[in-house]
Amino acid sequence: MSGERFLDRRGFLARGLAAASTALLGGCDDLSDQPWVKRVLDSAEELTRVTQRALLTPQALAREYSEADLSKEFKANGSTDPQEPDYLAHVKTGFADWKLAVGGLVEQPLSLSFEELRAMPSRTQITRHDCVEGWSCIGKWKGVPLSVVLDKAKLKENARYIVFYCADNLFDTGDEKDRYYESIALVDAYHPQTILAYEMNDQTLAVAHGAPLRLRVERQLGYKMAKYVMRIEAVDQIATIRGGRGGFWEDLGYEWYAGI
C-alpha cells in the first residue's frame, strides 16, 4: 500500500471550528443566508484549503488498498441513468461515436474517442470513495491520468482550473445549463491519482457509475468525482461559470474544496 499520509479534513474542521459554529449558528435557522455569515464560511473553507495544502505535499497520495479490500457492492448514487437524448443515443451505440472534447485555454483542442483514450498511458488504483453523506466504498479504477490529456492539449500559461461538463441533469429540466459540472485546481488535475476512469473493478464502466468516463480525484469527497464526463475546459477563473462556485453542488452551498 502506498501514500498513507493523509488528513481527515472533517475531523480537522470539527476540532477547529466546532465552538465557533455553535456560537454563530445555534438556534438561528436562517442565519446562514446572511451575507456576512457566507463570508465567514467562505473564509473558513479557504483556511482549510490552505492548511491542508501546507500539511500535504502536492504529490502526497491517497491510501491505496489491495484487491482483498474491495467492497462487495459499490454504491451508485446521484445520477444513475441519465435520460438526456444525446446521452441515450451514445448508450445505444455503446459510445462508439462518443468523443471527449478538450478545449478552453489550450494550444491544441482535442476530440478524443473512447478507443483513443484507452490507447493512452493508463493507471490502475484501488482507493476508497468517501461520500459527503457519510458512507464509503473501496473500488478498483483504471483510466488515463488527466495530466496526460492536459499535456496533449498543451495548457496555456493563464490556465488555472479544469472544468468538467457532464451529461446528467439532476433537476430533469431538459436545460443543458442545469447539467452537472465540476472543477478542480491544476494542483489536483496534475496529481498522479487523478484519472479519467473508464473501468471499475476490471469491467468497462457501467452507466450507473458514470459511463463512459468518470473523474477520480482521490484526495477529495465523492461529489467532486464527476460522472458522465462529456467535455473538459481549461479556464483562468470559475467565478463567471453558472453560479460562480465551481460546481453543481457548490452552487447549492457545498464547499468547492472538498479535500480529505
Language-model-derived ranges and their functions:
Residues 31-260:
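Structured, non-membrane catalytic/scaffold regions adjacent to prosthetic-group chemistry
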